[in-house]
Amino acid sequence: MDDSASDDILTVLTRYAAAWRAGDLQAIMSCYHDDFTLHYFGTSPLAGVHRGKGAALAVLADFSRRSRRRLIEISDIAAGATRGVILAREEISIGGRPVEIDRTLIYAVRDSLLAECWVLDQDQRLIDEMLQQVVD
């Protein structure tokens, strides 16, 4: 394993996680590469591959608006030679009812910035149903 690559990935993810915990939107946005790609699974209107920082961040902002998501905790950060992972717990709102979900966020890093993310939700069906219901 390339220790320098995993160290760089861990450094980037740790910086991102600190900004996320602090709710520092400017610092969060500075962690993304201009060519960032978001892989959002499921069958919701937000599902798909979103290429480019602007397009990907628009989807993330739309998810935040629809779900009223709130970070509860980042339980772990890990890094290997080619990917890093953040395990997060968030609260989302479904029909005004708060629900806690675990999310696994797998990242690729390039130029010391987040270059790609695969979002894996604990209950994809629940997420899809919530996103289908919220249309405003």
Question: What positions do the PLM features span?
Answer:
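Hydrophobic pocket/interface hotspot
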Residues: Y16, I28-M29, F36, G52, ...
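Short, cysteine-centered beta-strand-loop-beta hairpins and adjacent loop/turn segments enriched
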Residues: I92-E100
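Short, low-complexity N-terminal intrinsically disordered segments enriched in polar/charged residues
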Residues: M1-D34, L131-D136
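Short beta-strand segments enriched in hydrophobic/aromatic residues
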Residues: Y32, E90-I92, L105, L120-D121
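A solvent-exposed, acidic/Ser-Thr-rich amphipathic alpha-helical stretch
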Residues: L25-A27, H33-A81
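Short beta-strand edge/turn micro-motifs at domain boundaries
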Residues: D102-M130
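A short hydrophobic beta-strand element
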Residues: A81-E90
